[in-house]
Amino acid sequence: MSNYHIKHLEEYYQVYRKSVREPENFWEEIAEEHFVWRKKWDTVLNWDFLKPEVKWFEGAQLNITENCIDRHLTTRGDKTAILFEPNNPDEEAQHISYKELYKKVNKFANVLKQEGIKKGDRVCIYLPMIPELAISVLACARIGAIHSVVFAGFSAAALATRINDSECKMVITADGSFRGAKTIDLKGIVDEALKSCSCVKTVLVAKRIMTDINMTDGLDKWLAPLLYNASDECAAEIMDAEDPLFILYTSGSTGMPKGMVHTTAGYMVYTAYTFKNAFQYKENDVYWCTADIGWITGHSYIVYGPLANGATTVMFEGVPSYPDYGRFWDIVQKHKVNQFYTAPTAIRALAKQGSDLIDNYNLSSLKVLGSVGEPINEEAWHWYNDNIGKKKSPIIDTWWQTETGGIMITPIPYVTPTKPTYATLPFIGIQPCLMDENNNELKGNQVEGRLCIKYPWPSIARTIWGNHKRYKETYFSAFENKYFTGDGALRDEVGYYRITGRVDDVIIVSGHNLGTAPIEDAINEHPAVAESAIVGFPHDIKGSALYGYITLKGVGESRDQDNVRKEINQLITDRIGPIAKLDKIQFTSGLPKTRSGKIMRRILRKIACNETNQLGDTSTLLNPEVVKEIIDNALLK
């Protein structure tokens, strides 16, 4: 029996039992047999959730790019590593082999070194989904620089916050990006961000849209000529197991985004192992994750996980609706995609178009369908199963987080019987538990509580960059000696897990975690706004959308309310990005508050969801009369 590739349910239970009874022996075996090390570890695991501190494979030395590229050169050198599908279907796809990837990454790594980037330096990457994005990530890892990828839909203000927090010395960007029918001025956004960033010494600019842009002497450099002149050989920097690999920012329920730090060895082992099993990846399969590398899904399951397994990974620059809603299926047919991993928000948008369009495409290559970003609702699950999988391709509803680094709870296709809306069973080595509000573990089945993890896994984020205190407070203070996920979950009669949603002030919109505090901060900058509260409400496509309750100052009450709404959404776009715009804005004379002055978001959430019969006792509020006003004027269409 190979612990590395699980093929049936009995084997899953055997391997799972071993992984939780002897976790150190289990992960040592996986690490030893399936990866390349410059030096083996002294200890497999040191951990203490009270500090909190987690260290895997301490004493080991390696470079993750040797595991993702170099070791494949003799056996898979000519195999396609990255298959790039451009935004415009008339533009030819690019097949980058492992040999070519090796040369491209080395050239890029040499450019970074030439520009003064050293091991431990932070590099911000603000690029569209073009090959340079994956290559620059790997080039940083090649020389031991810490990459910080920022999704290229974030605003200049959001980009500047992230650059400053990790003190990036370099930004890698492009002249612009294509997104469906739109062209986005990425370089202009970087220029705006850098007005408030003194740490950046160099900006490397890739050409994508080929338009004239502003280039600042001494700061901005075109990437192409530097790559052309660089050597295609670059020795990999030897890294310690616990050296940081990357920082990735995720929304917090309070203002500042959290720079999650992932380290080298444990992250590599866990993402590779989860990729192999969660997608039942086999040699010569073509795998496609539709996420952006700006999110953790793209880091783990477009770049590192697939390449560590010598896979062919598809990178798609565009959107599912351009030039029409058949684009995903056109790509599946064209490249004979075997594993397809997308978000419920995309599935719902495609389902809305009906199934006639799908009949034009041959989807018979599909073996596994994946879902990520939020729990998939039942209607979308059945549509995906019936129309895309033709009831033959299992759906893996994967639950995990930026903080976890890799998939945590998921069915294994052709192994775990699936159940709509359920993430089903914990992945190998993962020990989930459900807790009540009094810090008691809920044992047995048919229970619901707060989802925690009892024992460390190799790819857990080690800290928040520059703020270990916040890391402890956020993840390890709610429940003693356990990692708290921030999610609620239930365990059914057979032990399957279903994620019931966030229990903090984070709303998942189109699969993206949005903290309410930063959005409210942006709104409250408007001169006409006195106070605001943001809640989520169900949305057919996005899963959740944002509903804003806003009280105006005297100056705002006399203004045209539609104009104020537009200005508020523009402020949000400028501060955070268009992803955080409000779908509904209701102006109200006040917000319901406790006598201590706390806004009762629970009540506002119920009103936004049209559940006003479940408000409970509002008589203890400081201002109960405002609840009736809000209900009477609620925007429920």
State where each predicted segment sits.
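Conserved pre-ATP/AMP-binding loop-to-beta segment of ANL
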Residues: 78-80, 204-205, 216-249, 256, ...
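Gly/Ser/Thr-rich phosphate-binding loop
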Residues: 304, 308-311, 338-342, 351-420, ...
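ANL superfamily adenylate-forming
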Residues: 89-90, 170-241, 353-354
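Conserved AMP-binding/adenylate-forming core of the ANL superfamily
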Residues: 65, 82-138, 155-160, 215-224, ...
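Conserved AMP-binding/adenylation subdomain of ANL enzymes
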Residues: 268-286, 296-339, 352-353
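AMP-binding/adenylate-forming catalytic core of the ANL superfamily
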Residues: 150-176, 190, 333, 340, ...
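AMP-binding/adenylate-forming catalytic domain of the ANL superfamily
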Residues: 202-207, 541, 574-599, 613-637
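Conserved ATP/PPi-binding loop(s) of AMP-dependent carboxylate-activating enzymes
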Residues: 425-429, 440-475, 514-516, 611-613
